[in-house]
């Protein structure tokens, strides 16, 4: 299956938002050309935010959202980590290597930014995702308790 991976910016955000709608509601909507809000434009201009989407037949079918967090101190020498915040592929498109391609994009970003590594969190109740990450070279490096406020 032919596909491309595109960085999301204000020019293609409407198409990306259509995919987010698809994920949230379980059905596609007509492509929207709604204007991108100033708040979203500012978010997309964040130099440490990287969002990439897989495009197949003119629509996005998956994405990865990454953020770069710098580390200070002599141990890190100013180099931080890439954190994968979210990785999703529409269920009917899974099994085509898109998630691996998106994770490869995170690897490329790590090299481009000279980051120390890539970190991500995976739910212990999501063994399919765990196997994907292991197949892409990720290893379990401890357990954590996830807390939010």
Each model region followed by its residue ranges:
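Active-site acidic-Proline motif in GNAT/NAT acetyltransferases
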Residues: 90-92, 96, 124-125
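Conserved GNAT acetyl-CoA-binding A-motif
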Residues: 110-122
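Conserved active-site alpha-helix within GNAT-family acetyltransferase domains
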Residues: 100, 124-143
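Active-site/acyl-donor-binding loops of N-acyltransferases
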Residues: 143-149
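Acetyl-CoA-dependent GNAT
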Residues: 3, 7-14, 18-79, 85, ...
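Conserved beta-strand segments that form the floor/walls of ligand-binding pockets within enzyme
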Residues: 53, 83, 88, 119-121, ...
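Conserved acetyl-CoA pyrophosphate-binding loop and the N-cap/start of the following alpha-helix
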Residues: 93, 97-105
